[in-house]
Amino acid sequence: MVKIHLEAINMKYRKDKYGNELSVLGYGCMRFPKKHGKIVMDIAEELLCRAVDQGINYFDTAYIYQGSEAALGEIFEKNNLRSRINIATKLPHYLIKSPQGLDKLFAEELRRLRTDYIDYYLMHMLNDIEAWQRLQDMGIEQWIAEKKAAGAIRQVGFSYHGNSDMFCRILDAYDWDFCQVQYNYLDEHSQAGRRGVEYAHSKGIPVIIMEPLRGGKLVGQLPEKARKIIADYPVQRTPAEWGLRWLWDQKEVTVVLSGMGSDFMLEENLRIAAESEVGQIPAEERDLYAQLVRAINENVKVGCTACGYCQPCPMGVDIPGAFAAYNRWHGEDKKNAFMDYLKCTTFRKNSTGAGNCIGCGKCEKHCPQNISIRQELKEVQKTLETPLYRVIKKGAGWFVHF
């Protein structure tokens, strides 16, 4: 086993809906180091054990994260850590074709994780209200109640990729224990955004943050101008520190997930967590974030601010989501841009992709940025709706209809 030596830090905690303390830094378990497509178990084990020793108690995985649930189960059992940690995993509702499928899939997750209960269970990528209604028709609310009564599930939430309007609708559709959203200083006004995060907080719903550094875009993929802004600032901090401090400054944020695949990442994030506080960012530093956002967005193809005035589209196109993915593609982050586009347009009853546009022009009448939305959506379709996209979309559509 690889040995990692970290100085002890004082982990900070924030409370969930029922007063349980969760570490402000959570461990995202989707991207463990791999070799030949398989998780390198000795490295993963050392990282996870050190994380627990340093006070991290929230570990996020999912059914579709290849090998992740099984790796966590093996490591936590081997090191007798189950009582010290909280496991969050996810129901891939888009794979469920019948009520019986709920029990079958959940049982498989318990087996993989080598446990008889899940602390935080999420509806994975619950991106529109129709998907929730489909689950309701399948008896999901009764199923959740039974699992909670039996102690097999302690809290239930959902993860989300989409606009703030739909996010708020889903929040209001059920008595959720928590939620999980993509949120960072670049996405303050896209995805669920600050509006969604603040609305969840107003309802007493804890918010778990994913993509806090935009999949590395806010660290290793910053444009030169943004890197210079950071380098020239009187207070010297790493790009990761700027990104994470922005989140922990907000009282609405409960846990920030980070996929820490090395001892360096783990050590840096632990240090930042220990030094971060709510309300710590002064006005002059907020101006730096605004400068960074402008620098990052200088080369964007579409000047969409994700205000949502163009919504709803009569054909269901997620216009802000499509443009966000398109801009990310042209920011030289093509792999994650493609995944973003898949998340916001598939795995739901009706596709919300750019290809649905019929050119009615209703959206353009309401756009405060005067974007030629119809023309730009054609470019999005041409760029992102590749043969691979169409294959995945077809498969996703089959799953959610049965």
Where are the language model's segments positioned?
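N-terminal binding-site loop/beta-alpha segment at the start of enzyme catalytic domains
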Residues: V2-I85
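Structured C-terminal cap/extension of enzyme domains
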Residues: R50-V52, I56-N57, F76, D175, ...
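Acidic, glycine-rich active-site loops and adjacent beta-strand->loop/helix elements
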Residues: L91-H93, L384
